[in-house]
């Protein structure tokens, strides 16, 4: 399957006979985003206003739709030249195992192929093999670090 830096791509999985729409258009609602994030138990879903604003101001938000239902989302922040950071890769549990996350990663890899680095930020170590399967490698001397302020945020 080829990926192009297009605004929309329709992917048909002939084996499963399923059709999903992949798009960079930010035409999702706060409620749709909140529902998706809560479906995977991500705390960000408890802050729909902030989450929506963050997504709207992100460099790339690739969403996956089953008709009118938001079933997958990937968010990327980039500096326009050298570094693109994948911050979210999530798929509704009812749609997991259908290859959606992998297709989103391949789309992002194609879009950012001219950047020096594409960083992935899996929040769970058990997701590292997924990224490795798609060509990512662990940084030898690096580690992800963060300050978590969500308990202080209202």
Outline where the language-model segments fall.
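A conserved beta-turn-beta hairpin within the catalytic core of GNAT-like acetyltransferases
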Residues: 78-86, 96, 141
């Amino acid at each position: 399957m080829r990926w192009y830096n297009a605004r929309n791509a329709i992917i048909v999985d002939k084996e499963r006979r399923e059709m999903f729409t992949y798009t960079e258009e930010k035409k999702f609602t706060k409620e749709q985003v909140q529902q998706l994030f809560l479906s995977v138990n991500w705390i960000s879903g408890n802050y729909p206003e902030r989450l929506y604003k963050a997504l709207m101001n992100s460099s790339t938000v690739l969403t996956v739709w089953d008709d009118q239902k938001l079933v997958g989302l990937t968010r990327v922040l980039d500096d326009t030249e050298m570094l693109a950071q994948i911050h979210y890769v999530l798929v509704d549990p009812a749609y997991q195992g259908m290859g959606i996350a992998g297709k989103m990663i391949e789309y992002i890899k194609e879009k950012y192929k001219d950047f020096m680095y594409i960083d992935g930020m899996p929040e769970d170590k058990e997701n590292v093999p997924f990224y490795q399967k798609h060509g990512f490698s662990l940084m030898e001397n690096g580690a992800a670090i963060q300050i978590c302020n969500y308990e202080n945020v209202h």
